[in-house]
Amino acid sequence: MEQTVLVPPGPDSFNFFTRESLAAIERRIAEEKAKNPKPDKKDDDENGPKPNSDLEAGKNLPFIYGDIPPEMVSEPLEDLDPYYINKKTFIVLNKGKAIFRFSATSALYILTPFNPLRKIAIKILVHSLFSMLIMCTILTNCVFMTMSNPPDWTKNVEYTFTGIYTFESLIKIIARGFCLEDFTFLRDPWNWLDFTVITFAYVTEFVDLGNVSALRTFRVLRALKTISVIPGLKTIVGALIQSVKKLSDVMILTVFCLSVFALIGLQLFMGNLRNKCVQWPPTNASLEEHSIEKNVTTDYNGTLVNETVFEFDWKSYIQDSRYHYFLEGVLDALLCGNSSDAGQCPEGYMCVKAGRNPNYGYTSFDTFSWAFLSLFRLMTQDFWENLYQLTLRAAGKTYMIFFVLVIFLGSFYLINLILAVVAMAYEEQNQATLEEAEQKEAEFQQMLEQLKKQQEAAQQAAAATASEHSREPSAAGRLSDSSSEASKLSSKSAKERRNRRKKRKQKEQSGGEEKDDDEFHKSESEDSIRRKGFRFSIEGNRLTYEKRYSSPHQSLLSIRGSLFSPRRNSRTSLFSFRGRAKDVGSENDFADDEHSTFEDNESRRDSLFVPRRHGERRNSNLSQTSRSSRMLAGLPANGKMHSTVDCNGVVSLVGGPSVPTSPVGQLLPEVIIDKPATDDNGTTTETEMRKRRSSSFHVSMDFLEDPSQRQRAMSIASILTNTVEELEESRQKCPPCWYKFSNIFLIWDCSPYWLKVKHIVNLVVMDPFVDLAITICIVLNTLFMAMEHYPMTEHFNHVLTVGNLVFTGIFTAEMFLKIIAMDPYYYFQEGWNIFDGFIVTLSLVELGLANVEGLSVLRSFRLLRVFKLAKSWPTLNMLIKIIGNSVGALGNLTLVLAIIVFIFAVVGMQLFGKSYKDCVCKIATDCKLPRWHMNDFFHSFLIVFRVLCGEWIETMWDCMEVAGQAMCLTVFMMVMVIRNLVVLNLFLALLLSSFSADNLAATDDDNEMNNLQIAVDRMHKGVAYVKRKIYEFIQQSFVRKQKILDEIKPLDDLNNRKDNCTSNHTTEIGKDLDCLKDVNGTTSGIGTGSSVEKYIIDESDYMSFINNPSLTVTVPIAVGESDFENLNTEDFSSESDLEESKEKLNESSSSSEGSTVDIGAPAEEQPVMEPEETLEPEACFTEGCVQRFKCCQISVEEGRGKQWWNLRRTCFRIVEHNWFETFIVFMILLSSGALAFEDIYIDQRKTIKTMLEYADKVFTYIFILEMLLKWVAYGYQTYFTNAWCWLDFLIVDVSLVSLTANALGYSELGAIKSLRTLRALRPLRALSRFEGMRVVVNALLGAIPSIMNVLLVCLIFWLIFSIMGVNLFAGKFYHCVNTTTGDTFEITEVNNHSDCLKLIERNETARWKNVKVNFDNVGFGYLSLLQVATFKGWMDIMYAAVDSRNVELQPKYEESLYMYLYFVIFIIFGSFFTLNLFIGVIIDNFNQQKKKFGGQDIFMTEEQKKYYNAMKKLGSKKPQKPIPRPGNKFQGMVFDFVTRQVFDISIMILICLNMVTMMVETDDQSDYVTSILSRINLVFIVLFTGECVLKLISLRHYYFTIGWNIFDFVVVILSIVGMFLAELIEKYFVSPTLFRVIRLARIGRILRLIKGAKGIRTLLFALMMSLPALFNIGLLLFLVMFIYAIFGMSNFAYVKREVGIDDMFNFETFGNSMICLFQITTSAGWDGLLAPILNSKPPDCDPNKVNPGSSVKGDCGNPSVGIFFFVSYIIISFLVVVNMYIAVILENFSVATEESAEPLSEDDFEMFYEVWEKFDPDATQFMEFEKLSQFAAALEPPLNLPQPNKLQLIAMDLPMVSGDRIHCLDILFAFTKRVLGESGEMDALRIQMEERFMASNPSKVSYQPITTTLKRKQEEVSAVIIQRAYRRHLLKRTVKQASFTYNKNKLKGGANLLVKEDMIIDRINENSITEKTDLTMSTAACPPSYDRVTKPIVEKHEQEGKDEKAKGK
């Protein structure tokens, strides 16, 4: 991080912005221009300074700057951000310290920054009241907009609003300027909105533009202005827009997939949905009506006669809807189909294509656009069961396959991909926030350093007084300003956080403490407590600490000293430090913090806190041996120091027993001091010092090393404390007089007698048992409330009323006693108490108002008592916290959502309200407004809310019918898209932020052991004690031998202790049981000799601790290591056994220092493995059995025993044989298959029935035989300890029982019949036999505990809504119906129950009946809520609720309209939150399990992973032999043409065009269009045939070696055949056009060529990766469906056909059952299937109805079985399957994105080999060195090396074989290494990869490299140098000789010649120097040598190489 320029913080940094400042800025700008006339913009953006993110406009001023001097508020100041130092800007700060940045240029060219008008405008603009005014205006405006027909006077109000907005804009424009400079009005996009709104307001006023209501909708945008006014919302909207960008790839993929599916749908179902059942033959009346008169001239024997003939008009007849067959109460005619498995018409009707499509004609596949809409609806799963049923009815049941594909691939996959992308985006955003926080922390530390330097002197001056202050509470506030300044800064934000928390938790939660009187008088005010201690709190960013730094190994062990502590429960804990002379390598200064080393987590650096970790124990209630221990100098002398860590991870060291152990403060475990084991001079090494520096703010040795340092530490601490107090006093929420008042009136401690009373009451009320009793009362009270039902007897009602009174009394008493015990002031300091008080008050108010009508709602508040359970139930607590957190965290998002809902509701009302009123007859037969309309704001809001719930299609049909298609589609689609983004974002954010692994795992150790656990613990101890006493008594009376007793005693002690500690996961330190470790990590022996004293800190230790820092500390070991809980103490037969097991314990203890569980032993966490396959059977019986019954012990050495043993071994071999297993699996499948035949028609098929009966017997015998064999082979012990065997055993038992019953003739008994249905479980046996399914099941079983926990919490949560529903609606859903028409009577005819009874007496057609799913009791309430939560069947429940009036009264249309809100609230909290919570839990769980069984990559660095993955891909590929180019010239030309990329791409374009022509087809196109399309199709067929022929010519027989080519060939052949035989094929097979659709798959090939499609490739890659896992889940789902289908057939085959059950969708046959179950897998339409099953008695059904062809009578259902069947199926399929689906996809998506982010991907290697093929046509795997340069240039990035690349290639040092050839892998390795960078760890991986390559390519020529490119170059260079040196030598010689002779001859010219000689030699030297540089360059570029691929032992091969060379020559 580059050093940020730090402005001196504090008030000195503010300067007024004056004319001089402006001049200075201008001067700087001029200087910069002079220096740098042409600024390079791009460069500046990349590397230049960036604006400081903390000083952005709109943010608050960082607190480091201190307070703004009052005279500077709202005045122009110089810019603080160094970035703007040479830009013309200034800032203004308002009272709230918000930063406003303005341009310093003249606004509107006339107003300079110093103009008084502009100054006033700025003051107004920055004032908080201004934004408040605007906010209020907007809200009022919104209220006016919701009026559907506003009165006339509102017109004037409109003008007022417009005026205010105009005023606002003018102020902004005057203050900021209009648009030219930065920070002017129009530079802010939010102001565009204002501008548009105002412009429109004036335009519509003065210009008449026609449709006013459409324009009025523009005013709605004003609501969006709220976003620009509230600061937090802008960022949220920004984030949403970002996530939309991220989603672009998924959107494209989704649209593409939908188009493909829509095309398939278009081809398959075009026109099918118009098939109707038309009456045929027509009746006489209809014949006459549809006859046309025709004048025909006929020739009678030559005479022409004119006749009128009546001809039947077929077309008009079939279009007449009167002759269509309608089911009663349905708007559309019944569909039918002409294939055998489609819907059939009743007698007297025939199936004809006529009339319009269903649902006003909007549901169809007739054109591409409607098909697309249908598919989109399928994907969003809205009312898709309707589409599914219509299509299957019209086309046939086989087409279920189409829906399965679309639902699984389209719906689940794509929608979850959107989820995955949003989750990733969110995760990245979080990461960014974290990094930013870390950076802030670092910057903050820098600033602190600066402050420290400035204030060092002041601090030293204050040191003397400071040490007094820490002892004298009254001396607060005498410090010098500067030092208080420092600490103010350093602790302010932490204080802010603490103050925020203080609202809730100010005092200690005194529950469960038995205190001595002197220990803590409540009367001491908090200030005095605070002054007794000192706290360090340094700014830490909340986010950083609370998030993900947990490791599974980090549970600290707390030691409970019950045996020797005077006060067991006082919790103390201690910091202690260890001198590091001996073990420098240790990880950091806290011995117990091994796994979260501060050095790793940047964010934690320099802040003194101990991180809270997952699984940490917070209660170390170690005994306190002495109260008056001596402390560090300057610490309070009243006792030990506590260190508490608050929820932000800030450590506070707090003095003495007067500490409030608040539930938030987390106590650190006791850390124990050993006498120093190091040399006493306390030397520290240099690395140690460095470590200290890096974590300077831990309480580390620095503080304790020498006295002066220590003194300073203390003084700093006290300075901090005092300032903290001042700060708190200055920040107290109320004026001081209130505090005085509360001290006098709210703290009651006037008389000592009262104090005694108080003390006694305190002892009673705070006792854990009282808490337990209260909890039991809460549960009972909840039960009482849940027992209300309708109709209730008087007596029962009375019991409930009395019960309520009693409970109210109990809770009131509890409250008053607590107030007495704690004083009102402290009582109301705690959240739970306030909550209790609120509820109690409400209950009392309710009792007072019991008889007032209409206040029954108050009763619902009693339900809140259920939440008191959260106090002692961690998961519920967590859920409430999560909901609380997320409501907080998502406050802004929720607000955005609310604004959006509001806007759309108003838009809908303005646009469509009028249409709904005018065209209502189109959608309602009685011309009354339907329930869902947009005529007023409330209904409009409900429609938008319903769309947000995902139910948009039905309301959209209505809207399209009344208001036109285009507008409705636009509005609804917008709501849908925004819904998906925002709602998904919302809930994902919620889940991800609230669900870090710690949340779930840390549930069991919340804050401290809660009172319930303490109470239960005591009960356990009591029971154990009583047991022991009885046992001892028995021993003494009956057993004389004292010896036995002696042995038993220690065991019981141990047992007893074990009970004590295991409940709390802690190991006890007993007199003879110290399971603690000393420094070396060994466990001390557990003899009686070792004493505990060693571990308890002696008083004198404190001093030695200070004077000699080289102390060692022993830390409690972690839970994982204490195997004491796991020792089976019952098995100890004697002392020696005990010793042995303790030794075992020692061995198994961890050897890691300071300890957490050893990483090396993952055995504890691995799944239970199947027993290994030994060839010897195991023992038959357990050892217990053998000891009891001696007869079970047989010697296997001789006689019968030996025969028995041999028999067992034979059986064992049989059972273990593969064939046996295969045979059994085959039998299981057959017997399961047999069950599918037992349907409604079995009685008519006698032969099949007989066969099945015999088969059943055979199967049963086989399975019994298998079971017996396994018993003999494995023995009972092994067989019955395996869960899968138990499953087999139980299923065999069921068959056996029913077989026996049949033989005895009891087959008709009810019990036996119901047993027979259990045969449906047979397929479960297949589970253990199929690996894939078993994996899924195991994963699920792992998730069950947490799923159950959440399920329970959800049930509690729903219970509240259910009881509330019972209170609101019980008995009010009854209504009087006309049984003939099914209509409800109007209120005018029937007002109440008695009226209805009178009607019934008069005629039989009326009936007083209830809605089937209602709120008459809590059970039905749950069912209703489930229907509401799944949005299936919720309409009827809601309508009934909204119409209800009172018990026994006839309902009236929308009487209690606002009951809708009950459902809205439930959907938000009950449905969205809880269901998403499930998804969260499941995903979280899978992640945890993955971590648990995590693969090898946990132990790899990121770099290694990248390299490893690259290599992994490498190893699997090998160069393919390309198709040889044909020798023939013509063929060769064609070959070149066909293999070019352009050819491929043009074919792709043709495919796409072909698709477009297919899209154009419609069902009712004219013959002309049909003929044109068929011609176009002909052209395409010709073109594709041409492609096929060309490829065949050029590729010859190689054409058929490529899969795609075969596919193309088949499609072409089919198309040609299809042209001629179209009629025939369509009649018998699928339309041939379908094959063309499959061609679209070829587009997948083109994706590789497009650079931009990387994202889409990643998504498809993720799909490919998820397929195996998804297949397993699918298999499991099929199994579940199969079992449920069988079960459904045996139970519901004969129910009455109504609502969702009809002739096609029923449980009569296996196929139909599967069709129904597939539909409810997505919970679609389950209410319809359940409704008929709820009929249990006449008149709803007829129990005596005869079913033809079967002996079963009646068509009644079994409600309890039905409800269980559907609810369990929905839970299993929804939770399990759908969520596992999500987990798998999220997982693979993240893997895929990681892969795509890697520097080298699969595609790069493919590209390498594709290019390779061109250079190595014969696939020799070698390439000549000359070609290498071209090859490297031909590759694409990142592997390519652009030319000139000779030197780089030489530098790569590639091994060459004879003929200067290089192997492809060597090249690829070298290039890969170049991309990934060098790393020393790669060699091992590399060898691995080479081995893998050798294995996969046995063809690899084993070759012997002779040399390498570098060596070759070096050889060449050496040769050249030698040559040149020799030549030079020769030249010199000749020159010398010549000159010598010459000299002889001509001495005169000698000098001249010498000069020449020198010149020549220089010239030569120059040449050789260039050669040298060449050489140095090539070696310089050379990274460490690249070894060969098959790297043999180098020396050996070099020798061999030389020999070969010699041979070669």
From Swiss-Prot:
Any GO molecular function: voltage-gated monoatomic ion channel activity involved in regulation of presynaptic membrane potential
Q: Where are the II repeats?
A: 750-1022
**Where would I find the III repeats?**
1200-1514
| TM annotation in the entry | 129-146, 153-177, 189-205, 214-235, 246-269, 398-423, 769-787, 798-820, 831-849, 855-874, 892-912, 966-992, 1219-1237, 1251-1276, 1279-1304, 1314-1332, 1346-1369, 1458-1483, 1542-1560, 1572-1593, 1602-1623, 1637-1655, 1666-1688, 1760-1788
Q: Where would I find the I repeats? A: 110-454
Describe where the IV repeats fall, as residue ranges on this chain. 1523-1821
Q: How does it sit in the membrane?
A: Multi-pass membrane protein
Q: How is its activity regulated?
A: Activated by the spider toxins Hm1a and Hm1b (H.maculata, AC P60992 and AC P0DOC5) eliciting acute pain and mechanical allodynia. Inhibited by the conotoxin GVIIJ.
Q: Where is this region: S1-S2 loop of repeat IV?
A: 1561-1571
Q: Which residues form the IQ domain?
A: 1915-1944
Its UniProt entry gives the catalysed reaction(s) as: Na(+)(in) = Na(+)(out)
SUPFAM superfamilies associated with the record: Voltage-gated potassium channels (SSF81324)
List the residue ranges of the region (S3b-S4 loop of repeat IV).
1619-1636
Q: Where in the cell is it found?
A: Cell membrane
Ordered alphabetically, the record's keywords are:
Cell membrane, Disulfide bond, Glycoprotein, Ion channel, Ion transport, Membrane, Phosphoprotein, Repeat, Sodium, Sodium channel, Sodium transport, Transmembrane, Transmembrane helix, Transport, Voltage-gated channel
Any single GO BP term: determination of adult lifespan
Question: InterPro entries, alphabetically?
Answer: Ion_trans_dom, Na_channel_a1su, Na_channel_asu, Na_chnl_inactivation_gate, Na_trans_assoc_dom, Na_trans_cytopl, VGCC_Ca_Na, Volt_channel_dom_sf
Q: How is it modified after translation?
A: Phosphorylation at Ser-1516 by PKC in a highly conserved cytoplasmic loop slows inactivation of the sodium channel and reduces peak sodium currents.
Keyword Phosphoprotein belongs to the record: yes
Q: Where does the record place Low complexity bias?
A: 479-492
The residues on the Cytoplasmic side of the membrane are 1-128, 178-188, 236-245, 424-768, 821-830, 875-891, 993-1218, 1277-1278, 1333-1345, 1484-1541, 1594-1601, 1656-1665, 1789-2009
Q: List every position bearing Phosphoserine.
A: 470, 523, 525, 550-551, 607, 730, 1516
Question: Domain comment?
Answer: The sequence contains 4 internal repeats, each with 5 hydrophobic segments (S1, S2, S3, S5, S6) and one positively charged segment (S4). Segments S4 are probably the voltage-sensors and are characterized by a series of positively charged amino acids at every third position. The S3b-S4 and S1-S2 loops of repeat IV are targeted by H.maculata toxins Hm1a and Hm1b, leading to inhibit fast inactivation of Nav1.1/SCN1A. Selectivity for H.maculata toxins Hm1a and Hm1b depends on S1-S2 loops of repeat IV.
Q: How does it assemble?
A: The Nav1.1 voltage-gated sodium channel consists of an ion-conducting alpha subunit SCN1A which is functional on its own regulated by one or more beta-1 (SCN1B), beta-2 (SCN2B), beta-3 (SCN3B) and beta-4 (SCN4B) subunits. SCN1B and SCN3B are non-covalently associated with SCN1A. SCN2B and SCN4B are disulfide-linked to SCN1A. SCN1B regulates both the expression at the plasma membrane and the voltage dependence of Nav1.1 inactivation. SCN3B and SCN4B reduce Nav1.1 conductance. Probably interacts with TMEM233; modulates the gating properties of NaV1.1.
This protein is called: Sodium channel protein type 1 subunit alpha
The species is: Rattus norvegicus (Rat)
